[in-house]
């Protein structure tokens, strides 16, 4: 079995990462009750004999001694990482695989990318190499970061190029949290656009998630729970927003619940790599099947169910509803409407007590309501993992390469241009060594080119197959 390394960058990246490890440990504990270190758990955890001085002797089989997450934690402030190291998961992280500073990036992409990137490049590379040495077959780096701040956007995208240069054959999956229009970081449009250029050039797959969608989801769940519409039938710990408290404090802040939704997404995304299944999907198959053109590697994700009812018998109707929900606006982790946009490809990653026949039936049922590009009408990729998430009998993660992502990028560009036309706050960036105004113009040109690619695809929508323009090949 292959291994993956999680790289969590900045405050947001580390908080989501911590939630992910908490949930992953609970999942493996529920399945692996004998405490045996097996291939499933080795995909994201090392088994270390803490009695061995130095790096700790890795144990490839037998009883679990001390689990260490295959993770690198990076932040240019100490607060969140220190909180993790004082929390219930403190022993899960290798303290040699942490990089922190005390000054922070000041919500400035240039500081994170240019200053801290140069300053910490060698240390970061050393941590990556060390993580790779502990893997028998390293398949993927998962990067978790936010786009609005300085460290996540700047340093988070700097290390993508480092990974591409050092490990060109290893996939780079990026989970990027996009700021909402009401973001309290006034320079977040600059940071996001500058980061987008790096994502366009150096990521294999990007899962864009916006804060507003996460907030809308938890608001809907809270409304249903508090209004009594769900009665007392919600299964304990089945809410996609719930956590056992990997981080201290902040119990009732919406960001905790929002982070848990993203952690659940990552949990389901990696389930085929961590558990057996009748139709497992390798992580490299996601990029292979869902990304037909290099730059169009942005995948819109949706998660269902958001909670599970306590009755054990699942009527087929409810199972079918799970598939329908995955294509509805309410379950998207990005403000998007995939059903009314154009699909390039779609992956359905199902977990739990679901049959292949259920999967096929629902694809056939939903197909007429979805529009795929003419050259990929059967652009479905499916997986079935037999192990459901804790608290659920079944779940579904849908990943769509769909033109519905375009409005998010257009809105981001508009917010960027509102600032840039006034040259507002530009001096904070230009005073950083290595930062020039051309960095901004190149970044917005890169985004404009990406939007144009989606425009060209949208132009083929509803066009008869025989009228579609043919690919011209230069001779």
Swiss-Prot record:
GO terms for cellular component: cytoplasm; microtubule; pericentriolar material. GO terms for molecular function: GTP binding; structural constituent of cytoskeleton. The keyword Lipid metabolism does not apply. SUPFAM superfamilies: Tubulin C-terminal domain-like (SSF55307), Tubulin nucleotide-binding domain-like (SSF52490). Keywords: Cytoplasm, Cytoskeleton, GTP-binding, Microtubule, Nucleotide-binding. GO terms for biological process: centrosome cycle; microtubule cytoskeleton organization; mitotic cell cycle. InterPro entries: Epsilon_tubulin, Tub_FtsZ_C, Tubulin, Tubulin/FtsZ_2-layer-sand-dom, Tubulin/FtsZ_GTPase_sf, Tubulin_C, Tubulin_CS, Tubulin_FtsZ_GTPase. Its main location: cytoplasm. Pfam families: Tubulin, Tubulin_C. It is found in: Cytoplasm, Cytoskeleton, Microtubule organizing center, Centrosome. GTP binds at residues 148-154. Belongs to the tubulin family. Found in a complex with TEDC1, TEDC2, TUBE1 and TUBD1. This is Tubulin epsilon chain. It comes from Homo sapiens (Human). The lineage of its organism: Eukaryota, Metazoa, Chordata, Craniata, Vertebrata.
């Amino acid at each position: 079995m292959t291994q993956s390394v999680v790289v969590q960058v900045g405050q947001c990246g580390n908080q989501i990462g911590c939630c992910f490890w908490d949930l992953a440990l609970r999942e493996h504990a529920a399945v692996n009750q004998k405490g045996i270190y097996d291939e499933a758990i080795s995909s994201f955890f090392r088994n270390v004999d803490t009695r061995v001085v130095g790096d700790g002797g890795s144990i490839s089989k037998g009883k679990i001694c001390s689990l260490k997450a295959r993770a690198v934690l990076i932040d240019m402030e100490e607060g969140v990482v220190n909180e993790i190291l004082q929390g219930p998961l403190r022993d899960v992280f290798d303290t040699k695989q942490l990089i922190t500073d005390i000054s922070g990036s000041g919500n400035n992409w240039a500081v994170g990318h240019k200053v801290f990137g140069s300053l910490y490049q060698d240390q970061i590379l050393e941590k990556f190499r060390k993580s790779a040495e502990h893997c028998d077959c390293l398949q993927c780096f998962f990067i978790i970061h936010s786009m609005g701040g300085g460290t996540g956007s700047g340093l988070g995208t700097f290390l993508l190029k480092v990974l591409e240069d050092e490990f060109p054959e290893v996939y780079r999956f990026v989970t990027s949290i996009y700021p909402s229009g009401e973001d309290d970081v006034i320079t977040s449009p600059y940071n996001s656009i500058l980061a987008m250029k790096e994502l366009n050039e150096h990521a294999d797959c990007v899962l864009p998630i916006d804060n507003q969608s996460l907030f809308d989801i938890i608001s809907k769940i809270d409304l249903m729970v508090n209004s009594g519409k769900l009665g007392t039938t919600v299964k304990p710990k089945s809410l996609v927003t719930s956590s056992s408290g990997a981080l201290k404090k902040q119990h009732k802040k919406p960001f905790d619940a929002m982070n848990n939704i993203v952690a659940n997404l990552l949990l389901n995304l990696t389930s085929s790599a961590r558990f057996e299944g009748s139709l497992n999907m390798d992580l490299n198959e996601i990029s292979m099947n869902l990304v037909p053109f290099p730059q169009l590697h942005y995948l819109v994700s949706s998660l269902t169910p958001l909670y599970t009812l306590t009755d054990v018998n699942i009527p087929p109707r409810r199972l079918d509803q799970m598939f329908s929900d995955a294509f509805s606006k309410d379950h998207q982790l990005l403000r998007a409407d995939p059903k009314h946009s154009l699909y390039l490809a779609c992956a359905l990653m199902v977990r739990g007590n679901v049959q292949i026949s259920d999967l096929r039936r629902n694809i056939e049922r939903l197909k007429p309501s979805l529009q795929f590009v003419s050259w990929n009408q059967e652009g479905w990729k499916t997986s079935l993992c037999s192990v459901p998430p804790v608290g659920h009998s079944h779940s579904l993660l849908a990943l769509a390469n769909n033109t519905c992502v375009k409005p998010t990028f257009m809105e981001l560009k508009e917010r960027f241009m509102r600032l840039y036309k006034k040259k507002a706050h530009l001096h904070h960036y230009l005073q950083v060594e290595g930062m020039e105004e051309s960095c901004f113009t190149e970044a917005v040109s890169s985004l404009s080119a990406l939007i144009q690619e989606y425009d060209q695809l949208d132009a083929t929508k509803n066009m008869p197959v025989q009228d579609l323009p043919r690919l011209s090949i230069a001779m």
